[in-house]
Regions:
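Contiguous, well-ordered alpha-helical segments that form the cores/surfaces of helical PPI scaffolds
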Residues: 111-124, 146
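Conserved catalytic cores of very large enzyme subunits
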Residues: 1-107, 128, 134-169
Length: 169
């Protein structure tokens, strides 16, 4: 990644994903400090929400869009929890011996929910009346992303696993 003229420092990056930014503060809470945990972290997987489609389906209906997005976030969480459980089961039963030896557990791995097509969501939602560069479109995106972040916190509390939000390509 390019750190010049950005708010990132090289020590903040733990992945080669283009936009994955793990909130390493959660790892600090889990013991061993940042240095002791960061090398043993990653993402279980990424489930991406197609925001452009939601904008199309819920044109002009923000409450409907948010309600459907919440349902999709729940489905994404269920999928990631099943994947986490399955991988951990197989690690514990010898299927992934190197992962078991070097990681031991998936406790320091995030479940990632991504969004894409935010500008297209705004354009579809507004029937092309405005886009992300318009204050109305920008404000809509801020509200949507704030809601997704709220849901990440709820999911962390409900599952005990770390969740993060990513802009997926």
């Amino acid at each position: 990644q390019n750190f010049i003229n950005s708010d990132l420092d090289p020590h903040m990056i733990r992945s080669m994903c283009c936009r994955l930014q793990l909130d390493l503060r959660e790892l600090l809470k889990r013991g061993n400090g940042l240095f002791g945990s960061a090398e043993l972290t990653g993402s279980i997987g990424v489930v991406t929400l197609n925001m452009a489609r939601l904008g199309y389906l819920y044109k002009g209906d923000e409450a409907g869009l948010v309600a459907q997005m919440d349902r999709l976030i729940d489905l994404a969480s269920q999928s990631l929890e099943i994947k986490r459980e399955t991988i951990q089961f197989h690690m514990d039963h010898g299927l992934f011996p190197y992962s078991k030896r070097y990681l031991g557990t998936l406790d320091n791995h995030f479940s990632t929910i991504g969004v894409n097509g935010m500008n297209e969501m705004v354009r579809n939602f507004s029937d092309d009346a405005y886009d992300l560069t318009d204050p109305r479109g920008f404000d809509l995106c801020v509200r949507i992303l704030d809601r997704v972040r709220e849901r990440m916190v709820e999911l962390q509390e409900a599952t005990g696993h770390m969740y993060n939000l990513e802009a997926t390509p």
